[in-house]
């Protein structure tokens, strides 16, 4: 049983402090006005400490070269790794790998070849994702770096190319959710159980497109490996980052790391660790920092949790699923989520609890158990400790250090009708093989136990001991007033106006056209059948815009209108035409309750403006609640965006009509204005070369 309690807090401070996310962004923002403090909602230009790309490095390089760039801005900022398709030995893939390596060598970029490990793990081991820095990657699991106390967040390929060329890109600081851990985990319960439970309990998009900061006394008891797993799967939870604090546990991890990397490592050495210790003492969230919401979970009430099938939003205790006698065909211990040394050791303790290889618990008949280390370094250490040999003795099948089945590549994929259980991060239908297979996610110990039992079950069953008991998972949600916390009012005297660039309008005004639906996807905005037709004219793009959502959109919406829609607008694929087709229609601003992060990035990158105003969406829905249903509705309401004062006004009847809503919004700084003026990120990059 899950106990959910909900209460609300309203913040009315005229000025406020910064949370840890905002403080880190402040450090890595460029072009800020003197004295400017950044907050959630603000658009900022960022110069991240590092940017990682993996097998997609060659597409990024092609974008980079197509921009007209000749040399990278700062080779020390860039990291190239090969990890996704390393089992593919085709000429085409090997040529791509050679191209990436050649490009990296030419430009002096740090390069890690196939077999060295998964890019995110390399970023951790080699100190690129260092505590209190901002590190990005053109991969959705960049959130992983939050386990090291670094702010990690994903970017799209165009952003990566821009960073290569100019050293910077842009970011809109998301609302920040605070997640507090209380209590202490039972033995054998892991970080994977925590995040699987969180995804299943708080499964109503509570943290969608939020940055997360983990807090609470319980964190000191969580090993770094647990933190990395939790941060990694904040992606599946819907968040844009998952940041843990810097504490003694993390500092000691780095001190122990010195014994492996040696005293002369460029990023992990006595000097960097001492500087981190000093900085961490003072670099903390302010006491009056604002959070969009707060979630609390009592770890002492947690047992082993399993998500699925085919969804991270569905989770059950392993005891409940064990009673259902769910037979499995395949098990997996791979990926950037759970293939570190402690994960392999956890599985080895299930298959070989005594350490005697002659007394191992064999993988059940009819089950294939695939495993790989997150890096070659981990594989070597696992072999030195006998962990690797124990898994082999149990009948597990080794794979090279890479992504493999997690991304649906290489050996061991799920076949039609099969059931798999995996220590990876995604169990979407078809992700790990056939769309007609069922996939569950669990901790390494539960995966290993299930492989031995031949069905989903717990380590305690294999060991013949009493299982971890829980009287019910305790969790609560404390939600701030969204309007106040994400857009705190400021007095006229305390708020400096946004500096405006010549050529950018101080006011953006238009009539609101309502497409009243949540989760309007990219195929609804721009039909997939046109996506890979490179000769579609701008006029045709305008005609087909939103046709899969509503065939009447084209006749109802006019150039100069402002489109307003529901929550999670632009979900789905990464096609840039979802943004450019709206521009072709003459719509330069989209307002929604919330946006898909990828759509938001593609919008700014192509000079389409967006604003999140959930209050407006609710007001419109209330206004037309009893009106005849229309997929596209001309509302008769107008929106004016006062850009210098970062405010919006919604009026009725005309731009000068009765004010129905006045609200503060995020500031659009001059760096972002310049991107829009240049026609998008690519145009801006070209202007900088």
From Swiss-Prot:
GO terms for biological process: lysine biosynthetic process via aminoadipic acid. Keywords: Amino-acid biosynthesis, Iron, Iron-sulfur, Lyase, Lysine biosynthesis, Metal-binding, Mitochondrion, Transit peptide. It is found in: Mitochondrion. GO terms for molecular function: 4 iron, 4 sulfur cluster binding; homoaconitate hydratase activity; metal ion binding. Belongs to the aconitase/IPM isomerase family. InterPro entries: Acnase/IPM_dHydase_lsu_aba_1/3, Acoase/IPM_deHydtase_lsu_aba, Aconitase/3IPM_dehydase_swvl, Aconitase_4Fe-4S_BS, Aconitase_4Fe-4S_dom, AconitaseA/IPMdHydase_ssu_swvl, Homoaconitase_mito, Homoaconitase_swivel. One of its GO terms (cellular component) is mitochondrial matrix. The keyword Transmembrane does not apply. PANTHER family: HOMOACONITASE, MITOCHONDRIAL (PTHR43822:SF2), HOMOACONITASE, MITOCHONDRIAL-RELATED (PTHR43822). Its cofactor is [4Fe-4S] cluster. Residues 1-17 form a transit peptide. Binds 1 [4Fe-4S] cluster per subunit. [4Fe-4S] cluster binds at residues 336, 403, 406. This is Homoaconitase, mitochondrial.
């Amino acid at each position: 049983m899950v106990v959910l309690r909900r209460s609300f807090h309203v913040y009315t401070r005229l000025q406020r402090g910064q949370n840890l996310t905002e403080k880190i962004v402040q450090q890595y923002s460029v072009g800020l006005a003197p004295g400017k403090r950044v907050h959630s909602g603000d658009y900022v230009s960022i110069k991240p400490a590092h940017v990682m790309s993996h097998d997609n490095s060659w597409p990024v390089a092609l974008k980079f070269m197509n921009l007209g760039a000749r040399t990278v801005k700062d080779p020390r900022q860039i990291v190239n790794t090969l990890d996704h398709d390393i089992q593919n030995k085709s000429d085409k893939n090997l040529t791509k790998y050679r191209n990436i390596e050649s490009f990296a060598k030419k430009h002096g970029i740090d390069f890690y070849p196939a077999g060295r490990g998964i890019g995110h793990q390399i970023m951790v081991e080699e100190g690129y994702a260092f505590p209190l820095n901002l590190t990005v990657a053109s991969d959705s699991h960049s959130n992983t770096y939050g386990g090291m106390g670094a702010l990690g967040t994903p970017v799209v390929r165009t952003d990566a190319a821009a960073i290569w060329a100019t050293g910077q890109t842009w970011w809109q600081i998301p609302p920040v959710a605070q997640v507090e851990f209380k209590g202490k985990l039972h033995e054998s319960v892991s970080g994977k159980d925590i995040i699987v439970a969180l995804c299943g309990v708080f499964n109503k998009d509570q943290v969608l497109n939020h940055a997360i900061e983990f807090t609470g006394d319980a964190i000191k008891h969580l090993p770094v490996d647990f933190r990395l797993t939790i941060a990694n799967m904040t992606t599946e939870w819907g968040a844009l980052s998952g940041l843990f604090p810097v504490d003694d546990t993390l500092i000691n991890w780095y001190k122990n790391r010195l014994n492996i990397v040696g005293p002369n490592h460029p990023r992990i050495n006595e000097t960097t660790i001492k500087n981190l210790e000093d900085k961490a003492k003072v670099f903390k969230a302010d006491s009056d920092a604002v959070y969009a919401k707060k979630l609390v979970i009592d770890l002492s009430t947690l047992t082993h949790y399993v998500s699925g099938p085919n969804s991270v939003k569905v989770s059950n205790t392993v005891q409940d699923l064990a009673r259902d006698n769910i037979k499995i065909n395949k098990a997996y211990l791979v990926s950037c989520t759970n293939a570190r040394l402690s994960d392999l050791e956890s599985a080895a303790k299930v298959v070989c609890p005594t350490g005697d290889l002659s007394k191992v618990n064999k993988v059940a008949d009819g089950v294939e158990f695939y495993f790989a280390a997150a890096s070659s370094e981990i594989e070597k250490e696992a072999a030195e400790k006998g962990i690797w040999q124990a898994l082999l003795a149990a009948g597990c099948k080794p794979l090279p250090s890479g992504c493999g089945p997690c991304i649906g590549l290489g050996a061991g994929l799920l076949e039609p009708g099969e059931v798999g259980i995996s220590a990876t991060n995604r169990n979407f239908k078809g992700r790990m093989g056939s769309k007609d297979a069922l996939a569950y996610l669990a901790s390494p110990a539960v995966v290993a136990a299930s492989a031995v039992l031949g069905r989903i079950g717990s380590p305690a069953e294999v060991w013949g001991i009493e299982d971890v008991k829980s009287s019910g998972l305790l969790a609560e949600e404390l939600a701030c007033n969204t309007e106040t916390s994400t857009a705190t009012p400021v007095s006229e005297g305390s708020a400096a106006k946004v500096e405006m660039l010549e050529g950018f309008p101080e006011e953006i005004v238009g009539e609101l056209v309502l497409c009243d639906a949540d989760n309007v996807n990219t195929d609804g905005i721009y039909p997939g059948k046109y996506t890979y037709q490179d000769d579609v004219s701008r006029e045709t793009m305008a005609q087909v815009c939103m046709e899969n959502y509503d065939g009447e959109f084209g006749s109802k919406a006019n150039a100069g209108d402002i489109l307003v829609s529901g929550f999670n607008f632009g979900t789905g694929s990464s096609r840039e035409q979802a943004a450019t087709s709206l521009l072709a229609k003459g719509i330069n601003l989209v307002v929604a309750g919330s946006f898909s992060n990828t759509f938001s990035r593609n919008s700014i990158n192509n000079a389409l403006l967006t604003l999140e105003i959930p209050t407006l969406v609710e007001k419109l829905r209330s206004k037309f609640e009893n009106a005849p249903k229309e997929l596209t509705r001309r509302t008769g309401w107008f929106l004016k965006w006062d850009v210098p004062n970062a405010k919006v006004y919604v009026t009725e009847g005309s731009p000068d009509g009765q004010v129905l809503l006045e609200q503060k919004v995020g500031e659009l700084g001059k760096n972002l204005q310049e991107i829009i003026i240049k026609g998008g990120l690519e145009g801006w990059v070209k202007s900088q070369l």
